[in-house]
């Protein structure tokens, strides 16, 4: 029996909706990364984008554990000499784009390269509870029920 290899034409992508309210960012990002890569499917093939489309709502209400809210720093470089910049998780969450915390966490759990970039395009993160993907009829995934450690009571 030969090893099963999924062909890109055979891929069936589902739409999944996740409410991030009260969920721990790292655990949520790990689950999302696995869904984007398709590792939860029996038809997983490493070189094929066979993951699902994931919609995350209420990203601003996701929770960081420990002192990460105040101490975790996000760095980037402008490209100019001495252009290293940093922001804390608190500044990002309270800023204009709080969904970036979840996006960055997932991005750093997905492989770097052309396939990883293509898989990241299947992730849609929204700070509030509204999203424009009702027509896709996404299936709701209750992450809090999967494991009690996935939530953090404030």
Swiss-Prot record:
Any GO molecular function: mRNA binding
Keywords: Ribonucleoprotein, Ribosomal protein
GO biological process, one term: translation
Pfam family, one: Ribosomal_L13
One cellular-component annotation, GO: cytosolic large ribosomal subunit
Functional summary from the UniProt entry: This protein is one of the early assembly proteins of the 50S ribosomal subunit, although it is not seen to bind rRNA by itself. It is important during the early stages of 50S assembly.
Homology family: Belongs to the universal ribosomal protein uL13 family.
Cited NCBIfam families: rplM_bact
PANTHER family: LARGE RIBOSOMAL SUBUNIT PROTEIN UL13M, RIBOSOMAL PROTEIN L13
Subunit structure of this chain's protein: Part of the 50S ribosomal subunit.
Protein name (Swiss-Prot/TrEMBL): Large ribosomal subunit protein uL13
Gene that specifies this protein: rplM
């Amino acid at each position: 029996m030969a090893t099963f290899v999924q062909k890109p034409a055979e891929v069936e992508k589902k739409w999944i909706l996740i409410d991030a309210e009260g969920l721990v960012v790292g655990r949520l990002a790990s689950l999302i990364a696995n869904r984007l890569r398709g590792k939860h499917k029996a038809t997983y093939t490493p070189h094929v984008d066979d993951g699902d489309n994931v919609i995350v709502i209420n990203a601003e209400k996701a929770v960081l554990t420990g002192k990460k809210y105040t101490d975790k720093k996000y760095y980037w470089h402008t490209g100019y000499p001495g252009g290293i910049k940093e922001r804390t998780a608190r500044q990002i969450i309270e800023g204009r784009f709080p969904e970036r915390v979840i996006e960055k966490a997932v991005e750093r759990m997905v492989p770097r390269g052309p396939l990883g970039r293509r898989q990241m395009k299947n992730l849609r993160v929204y700070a509030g509870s509204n999203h424009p993907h009702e027509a896709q009829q996404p299936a709701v995934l209750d992450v809090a029920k999967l494991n009690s450690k996935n939530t953090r009571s404030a």
